Regions:
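Catalytic cores of the polymerase beta-like nucleotidyltransferase superfamily
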Residues: 1-354
Length: 354
């Protein structure tokens, strides 16, 4: 409702579904073969609305007339027990809207509660129902889950219920390997993101998506090189498009973010190339900072040459222009003279004038 210059959100009481004859007549509600609600414009009383809520802690109403709280589903008791409990049969409610599984996880982490056993148990079996949710809706849900300032704990709980691989199917095989560099990388990125959010620093969803899909990208690149006989440059760019295309089938990442994801990935290939003016040009790139932060985490997890490269870029940013030239000179000497010189074009000997 528009009230002056403000927009006030108004919630409508929802009622129970009518029988089949009424449904066909009024076309107010509709369910899929999986039991998912496709249309739900059934209006009702406050008591019916309370029964339609997902969790008991969500079925409380504040009356501004007498400042009282109407608790229809023992929500206060659930708060005291620090427990997220479903209203009604959990399996049926999850089938009606599988996103409720994500909401259960999000509320549990956000409120510091546990999910009751009756509410949690069906999630293991019903997690694949997430495939029936529109990809555009899942994008918004993922932002709520991972950009809440508690993304790491949310990820761990999603993974416990096999929900994370439903959101990122290409990560499925990697999530089953304990103590791997892939899992360490994901957890470090989420930890860093949580720290930035909790410090009121700017974050972009593109960085999260770039990190979550980095190792599927590397794996796909290797497949193209081995099976297709492509060089690394062509294989990498083909894999880049493949991985993003597959992910967008599940989560509709807007183009403004996929462009940044591509740039972060592509700059990982350019950061090792520091000869001539390339290092200075790299500093001026709009996405250098994001790509540099990405490289730092890769180096922290994988070590070796990546860690050395990340440290070089850290030092290069912190010294004055004269010292930067010195760093490049040392690099050229260390690499045996630097990048190969451009070959002059052979023109052949001039013929003598006759």
């Amino acid at each position: 409702v528009v009230f002056g210059r403000e927009i006030i959100e108004v919630a409508t009481f929802r009622g129970h579904h009518p029988n089949q004859d009424e449904e066909a007549k009024d076309n107010l509600s509709k369910q899929s073969d999986h039991g998912q609600l496709l249309r739900d414009n059934v209006f009702g009383s406050i008591e019916e609305d309370a029964e339609r809520r997902d969790f008991t802690v969500n079925a409380m109403y504040y009356n501004i007339a007498d400042f009282s709280i109407h608790d229809f589903a023992k929500g206060m008791q659930a708060i005291e027990k620090r427990e997220i409990s479903m209203i009604g049969d959990p399996a049926t409610r999850y089938r009606e809207d599988p996103v409720r599984m994500l909401r259960a996880v999000r509320f549990a982490v956000k409120l510091g509660m546990k999910i009751s056993p009756d509410t949690a148990n069906p999630m293991y079996e019903l997690a694949p129902l997430m495939a029936n949710i529109p990809s555009a809706r899942l994008f918004e849900e993922v932002l709520k889950l991972l950009l809440s300032g508690q993304g790491l704990e949310t990820y761990k709980l999603l993974n416990e219920f096999n929900l994370f691989e439903q959101l990122f199917p290409q990560l499925g095989p990697l999530l089953k390997t304990q103590n791997s560099r892939e899992l360490a990388f994901i957890e470090q990125v989420l930890m860093n993101t949580d720290n930035r959010i909790n410090s009121d620093m700017k974050v972009t969803p593109a960085f999260i998506f770039a990190a979550l899909l980095w190792y599927p990208l590397e794996e796909r690149c290797q497949q193209h090189m081995v099976e297709g006989g492509l060089n690394h440059f062509d294989a990498f760019n083909l894999a880049l498009s493949d991985v993003l295309h597959r992910q967008i089938q599940r989560i509709m990442i807007p183009k403004r973010f996929t462009i940044t994801v591509r740039e972060i990935w592509q700059l990982q290939q350019r950061l090792p190339k520091r000869y001539g003016r390339r290092a200075f040009q790299m500093l001026e790139h709009p996405k250098f900072r994001a790509a540099y932060d990405f490289l730092l985490i890769r180096g922290q997890i994988e070590g070796g040459e990546l860690l050395t490269l990340a440290q070089w870029w850290t030092d290069f940013q912190n010294v004055d222009p004269e010292e930067r030239q010195g760093m490049l000179q040392v690099l050229r000497e260390k690499e045996g003279g630097g990048a190969p010189k451009r070959r002059s074009r052979y023109r052949g000997k001039k013929k003598a004038a006759q």
